[in-house]
């Protein structure tokens, strides 16, 4: 059962009920709290575009607790984060794994955060293929190209040499918040909610 909390806000015109995600969106906060598929990506991209149209000068925050998911869906979010004018800060709560970790690192440099007990996991893309040999070969070439593309972006976002990223993403590589900071995936481990993260 998916229960979405409702909050009541008092205004001079009376009370107004919001689902919690709509209320957070008013404060320019987007929640990425699930696996990343096309539906999730479309929702996140729509929220980013809406917030840019509302105020292109004001930062946006994305809170991430995600096991990862589809590369193409994640890249749609990544490209939109880079495309829009507002700076996008990212905050890891719980776990940012796979494409979730990639999006965490994709936040505005200096505005990528993690809570102290959160974890980050990076690895190479997962995929599979079936069918005729030529179809399997096409799929294998594509996943290798995607791996190279993701590794290059991670190297640029973290400041790590490409060879280090290639080695470290060869298998599941879990990092604590402090290790993610040292590696360059984030810029600060948050212990208190402060206005400087927005």
From Swiss-Prot:
- Entry's Gene Ontology cellular component terms: cytoplasm; endopeptidase Clp complex
Identify the EC number(s): 3.4.21.92
- Listed InterPro entries: ClpP, ClpP/crotonase-like_dom_sf, ClpP/TepA, ClpP_His_AS, ClpP_Ser_AS
Q: Keyword Cytoplasm, does the record have it?
A: yes
Disulfide linkage: none
Please name the GO terms that the record assigns under molecular function. ATP-dependent peptidase activity; ATPase binding; serine-type endopeptidase activity
Q: Where is the active site?
A: 98 (nucleophile), 123
Catalytic activity as recorded in UniProt: Hydrolysis of proteins to small peptides in the presence of ATP and magnesium. alpha-casein is the usual test substrate. In the absence of ATP, only oligopeptides shorter than five residues are hydrolyzed (such as succinyl-Leu-Tyr-|-NHMec, and Leu-Tyr-Leu-|-Tyr-Trp, in which cleavage of the -Tyr-|-Leu- and -Tyr-|-Trp bonds also occurs)
For biological process, the GO terms are: protein quality control for misfolded or incompletely synthesized proteins
Under the heading Pfam families, the entry gives: CLP_protease (PF00574)
What keywords sit in the KW lines?
Cytoplasm, Hydrolase, Protease, Serine protease
Per UniProt, subcellular location reads as: Cytoplasm
Q: Matching PROSITE patterns, A to Z?
A: CLP_PROTEASE_HIS, CLP_PROTEASE_SER
Oligomer and partners: Fourteen ClpP subunits assemble into 2 heptameric rings which stack back to back to give a disk-like structure with a central cavity, resembling the structure of eukaryotic proteasomes.
Q: What does this protein do?
A: Cleaves peptides in various proteins in a process that requires ATP hydrolysis. Has a chymotrypsin-like activity. Plays a major role in the degradation of misfolded proteins.
Query: Per the similarity annotation, which family is this?
Result: Belongs to the peptidase S14 family.
What PANTHER family does the record tag this protein with?
A: ATP-DEPENDENT CLP PROTEASE PROTEOLYTIC SUBUNIT (PTHR10381:SF70)
Indicate what this protein is called per its UniProt record: ATP-dependent Clp protease proteolytic subunit
Organism of this sequence = Bacillus velezensis (strain DSM 23117 / BGSC 10A6 / LMG 26770 / FZB42)
């Amino acid at each position: 059962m998916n229960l979405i909390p409702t909050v009541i806000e008092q205004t001079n015109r009376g009370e107004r009920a919001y689902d919690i995600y709509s209320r957070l969106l008013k404060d320019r906060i987007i929640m990425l709290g699930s696996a990343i598929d096309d539906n999730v990506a479309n929702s996140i991209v729509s929220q980013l575009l809406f917030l840019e149209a509302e105020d292109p000068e004001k930062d946006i925050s994305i809170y991430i607790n995600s096991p990862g998911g589809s590369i193409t869906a994640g890249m749609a979010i990544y490209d939109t984060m880079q495309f829009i004018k507002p700076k996008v800060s990212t905050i890891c709560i719980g776990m940012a794994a796979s494409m979730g970790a990639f999006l965490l690192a994709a936040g505005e440099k200096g505005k990528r955060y993690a809570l102290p007990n959160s974890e980050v996991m990076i690895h190479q893309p997962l995929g599979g293929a079936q069918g005729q040999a030529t179809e399997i070969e096409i799929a294998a070439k594509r996943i290798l190209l995607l791996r190279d593309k993701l590794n290059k972006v991670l190297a640029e976002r973290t400041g790590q040499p490409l060879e280090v990223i290639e080695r470290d993403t060869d298998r599941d590589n879990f990092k604590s918040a402090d290790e993610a900071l040292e590696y360059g995936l984030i810029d600060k481990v948050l212990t208190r909610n402060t206005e400087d993260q927005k």
